[in-house]
Amino acid sequence: MGPSNEHSSGHRNNFDLLRLFAACQVMFSHAWNWLHLGDPLNGTWVFDLLFSAPGVAIFFLISGFLVTDSYIRSSSAASFFVKRSLRIFPALFVNIAVMELALLVTGGLNVTGILQYLFYFTVYILTAARIWAVYFTYEPYTMSGFYGASDPSGVLWTLTVELTFYLTLPMLLEIWRRWKRAGALVVAVAALGSWVMAQHFNITDKYNPFLSVTAGPTFWIFSMGVLARLYWHRVSKIFEGKLLWWLATHLAITWWVAGTSAAFISINNAAPVDAFRIAVLAGLVLSAAHSLPRPNLLRRQDLSYGIYLYHMLVMHTLIAIGWVGHWWLWIVEPVGTVALAALSWALIEQPAMKLRTSLVARRLSVA
């Protein structure tokens, strides 16, 4: 998951609402499995609806659209990377620091040397990938203590993927800027190659812990948003004001596959039926973003990133205490997560975004 705050069409869209929906879908789907809250509902229409719109896929789709828009409107690649960095890293730094501190005070972290650990921590922050930090430095975790062998997060891999999207996209868009048709073809070919790679992982049942957290096997989802933004002037009529049509199509397909193995959309397997359903979901997301826009409904309070960052820390804390399977966890988990997300927004994310706005304005005034 990667947060975005640039909006096309003068901010007249529902992307903030959709990111919040995606974050909540991820939180509730994890509560369903990890806290065993959904066990009585497995195989029901509630299961089919919840898992028919995977939040991670929605994040990637929205990110493809908005990050492409951000790059196109940026004065330079450096400006683009500064904006992205100020949106991603401040909240990520605090989130990882909180988790590491929680592990340290509960016996799950063994700091054998300050410099060695600082190197590890730096790699962890810059990549959002604990597995990469461990590989390039050392293993500081005891796999014991309050949290046991569990990673208090476990969701940051999507940010690692998102960061590789940010590194890949400028190269593709520079080709598109110079040669429109060739650039679009390159994006499409890259998307096809990404889908083939994901299919290879699925068919061979092989999981590469390093390649799997890059743009490689998931760029095909991100590219749907990229191509939609590049050709929005041509395709917008397919989506704007067509929310009911796209929703009806999505629900009809969900009903058709209900009760089968295809009811659960997996972005990791990328089977043809999953790819088709994600393409339909992309249409639904783009239509929902540009139908009946309510840009001020959230009053410019974007909690989606914080919910994504902290929901698993709250969940693993509940599991470590021994609270699983209780109906009231449907309340405790979201309330605890939203409280932390609100703090993250007010104390970290919003000030960082104001700094970003100030830096961009200062650069424009100098220019």
Swiss-Prot record:
NodX probably forms part of a complex with membrane proteins specified by other genes in the nodABCIJX operon. InterPro entries: Acyl_transf_3_dom, Acyltransferase_3. One of its GO terms (molecular function) is acyltransferase activity, transferring groups other than amino-acyl groups. One of its GO terms (biological process) is lipopolysaccharide biosynthetic process. The lineage of its organism: Bacteria, Pseudomonadati, Pseudomonadota, Alphaproteobacteria, Hyphomicrobiales. The keyword Transmembrane applies. The keyword Nucleus does not apply. It is found in: Cell membrane. It comes from Rhizobium leguminosarum bv. viciae. It is a multi-pass membrane protein. The chain crosses the membrane at residues 15-37, 46-66, 88-108, 109-129, 155-175, 183-203, 208-228, 245-265, 270-290, 312-332, 335-355. Not known. NodX allows Rhizobium leguminosarum biovar viciae strain TOM to nodulate Afghanistan peas. GO terms for cellular component: plasma membrane. Belongs to the acyltransferase 3 family. It holds the Pfam family Acyl_transf_3. Keywords: Acyltransferase, Cell membrane, Membrane, Nodulation, Plasmid, Transferase, Transmembrane, Transmembrane helix. Its main location: membrane. This is Nodulation protein 10.
